[in-house]
Amino acid sequence: MIADFEVFGRDVVSVADVATALGVATDSRRLKNAIHELVKLGWLSPLSTRGAYEFLPARGGPHPRGDPLVEARAVRARRPDFSLAVIGSGASFLRGFSERAPSRYAVAVDKRQGGSVALMVAYDVVKTTAKRISDIPDLHDVPVSDAAHLLADAALWPRISGDLRDADHWLRRVLQTMDPAAAAAIALRAGTAATARMAYIAARFDSPIVAAAIAEMLTDRARTCIGAAGDPIVARDQALGVDDRLGIATR
């Protein structure tokens, strides 16, 4: 059974998977004993998702690998129609734009669907609309924000995108690789206020072409801010209608 899981590259296995490998019923005593023994020996590690385990293959030894996507994969395996995406700093690290992983990853979910205790245990969960996390490409079987979506993440949820005041923030590297047309297409789904913030952030990180492409999507002048509403205004873009209370790229 262990060899089969390794051959097929399984990193998340369910109770049903183990039962199938053993050729027993899911409610059998033999199955329960086998899972208990596999956990004891370090081959399986229980996940927060009910009935799911992380498989720890022999090539790495029976020790946890620290895969940040394993809980998200387990939730999707159990609920294939569940809409989620890894966003912000965690996505930036996984996509290779930042060198440091966050202490805790953030996951956006469609607010219209039921919640997930497993996700809330493993991640910072942001509830949003389905269209804001649609079409995010998969990375290792989990949707993870790519370059254009990372800019939208920063505009929508600045707190999960690191310190945007840093002039050498990873967004600068993201913007250098970004397709302006792709960013503009995503801005159409983000809403007027977020679109204005996307354009402003791109401009602050010296990407005028991306900023202009996004700004063209605006049909009305926005009235929005970046940062806490009670904080003083650091900068203001009258054309976009953005008050910067955070100080994007000022340090």
PLM region descriptions:
Residues 1-81, 176-196:
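Short beta-edge/loop segments at beta->alpha junctions of small alpha/beta modules
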Residues 23, 43, 96, 156-159:
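Hydrophobic/aromatic-lined pockets within catalytic cores
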Residues 45, 54, 108, 124-126, ...:
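Residues in well-ordered beta-strands of folded domains
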Residues 49-51, 104-106, 164-167, 186:
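Short coil/turn segments at secondary-structure boundaries
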Residues 83-136:
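Exposed, interaction-prone assembly regions rather than primary DNA-binding/catalytic cores
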